[in-house]
């Protein structure tokens, strides 16, 4: 039974049969939901600094709760 995975970059759910799984030389795997996420990761951009990622949205919500 296929299962839903989570994008390791932006945090969104990846439907079965979609997305990209990158296997590193050491055997670790990284799942991407789109080429947008894959390219931003390759460029070394931090997901927490991009407004469209769930990671950044989660941190923004925590900052608002503290204020």
Curated annotation (Swiss-Prot):
Gene3D superfamilies: Ribosomal protein L24e (2.30.170.20). SUPFAM superfamilies: Glucocorticoid receptor-like (DNA-binding domain). Its cofactor is Zn(2+). Pfam families: Ribosomal_L24e. InterPro entries: L24e/L24_sf, Ribosomal_eL24-rel_arc, Ribosomal_eL24-rel_N, Ribosomal_eL24_CS, TRASH_dom. Zn(2+) binds at residues 7, 10, 33, 37. One of its GO terms (biological process) is translation. SMART domains: TRASH (SM00746). The keyword rRNA-binding applies. GO terms for cellular component: ribonucleoprotein complex; ribosome. The keyword Amino-acid biosynthesis does not apply. GO terms for molecular function: rRNA binding; structural constituent of ribosome; zinc ion binding. A zinc finger (C4-type) spans 7-37. Residues 48-67 are annotated as: Disordered. Belongs to the eukaryotic ribosomal protein eL24 family. Binds to the 23S rRNA. HAMAP family: Ribosomal_eL24. This is Large ribosomal subunit protein eL24. It comes from Haloarcula marismortui (strain ATCC 43049 / DSM 3752 / JCM 8966 / VKM B-1809). The gene is rpl24e.
């Amino acid at each position: 039974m296929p299962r839903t995975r989570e994008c390791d970059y932006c945090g969104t759910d990846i439907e079965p049969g979609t997305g990209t799984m990158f296997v590193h030389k050491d055997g670790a795997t990284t799942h991407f939901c789109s080429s947008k996420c894959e390219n931003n990761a390759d460029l070394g951009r931090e997901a927490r600094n991009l407004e469209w990622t769930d990671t950044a949205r989660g941190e923004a919500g925590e900052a608002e709760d503290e204020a």
